[in-house]
């Protein structure tokens, strides 16, 4: 990839991936790497600029995360955010102290709008603070360019050394002018021109795939979800009939989804498609398993085993395609970062894979970028904007062990929920919505009889990047209609609850 590059050094804060997302929204490509990456590795990216993220640690703690000090001598512009600002100060001879009053939430700051970082930003502007410590004495040569009532060094800079830092979080939506500040860093300070465009990504990917694959055969894992569908069409554009797509119907799909996938890819696209119906195989392997991580690993392994079995039938296959995307990689752990949960595409692979290589053409893209790539490729809108669906399917939306009866129950409830959301015209406003079959039963009354059936959870969120998400404010009358239909039309359900937890602290999926 020959795009301009911004490097994001990850110090473990909760908003870190939003930084990468905001940079890309500004048409500049960036990658996230661990804070302790070697100087040689950092230099190898030939980056136009570097951003230090926030983090949960105090720079005053023993063993606090620190980057290679040589970063400050590269001459590359550096922007430190929150912890990144405090780290910059301490490593360059300044000092950090505990604040008399912790700042958390929206705070008004006063900025020096004559400085390049704050061009087109109001002198008094709102920003999002989340800190207990602050820089009380900036390093030699630095000047203060912003302050708040409780933070005398809200931002600082050393223009000659191209070093900049802010105590607040410009990447979050609660800092209204944050995007402008980041663009100022990218364009006014780093000199970026903005060459990260989806059309060039698609074109470059097609060329790279052709060069990599040559005349060899490729097998694609197709689920019918957005990620694997875009990956399949992208690969097909590059190599045509050398691609064979295997659609594994593991019995964990949504209602009618298996037939819809076959209809679209076999008839609408001239793609070699093999549908493998193996519901019994998966359910047998998952029998009695309730731990979500174990479910994911088993499903990932079975997927690969199925692919290997089919590959033997069709002859020599050199490459396996997967629809891994950037949030999959991030949430499965970057460097020393804690693993939130393994993702099917990256954590479910067994150690031995009987293929030459895994190809992950979407590995560097966020979800909305995948959709844009799909539109660029001419994929129909109803497929590009299909609801996100995890690789393990409904297995991680049934809490506890799996049975066919539970899956069928969940399928019916999910279908009703999606049908009513679409009928209400909310399907484009809510980014992801689904039902979860809990492993809890509750007492109810239907007619004159006592019932003791499952409690069902509704989950719906709004998000721009799926790294953070807010629970969707669905109107009460819609929720009432969904609840009434489900308890009347689906056996085994007598109670509906609505999940009003954001991400973080929760993940979007329950497992």
From Swiss-Prot:
One Pfam family cited in the UniProt record for this chain: GATase
Residue ranges constituting the Glutamine amidotransferase type-1 domain according to the UniProt record: 5-195
GO molecular function: ATP binding; GMP synthase activity
Domain GMPS ATP-PPase residues, every copy: 196-386
Origin: domain of life: Bacteria
Gene Ontology cellular component annotations, sorted alphabetically: cytosol
E.C. code: 6.3.5.2
Keyword Nucleus: no
Pathway: Purine metabolism; GMP biosynthesis; GMP from XMP (L-Gln route): step 1/1
Residue intervals passing through the bilayer: none
Name recorded for this polypeptide: GMP synthase [glutamine-hydrolyzing]
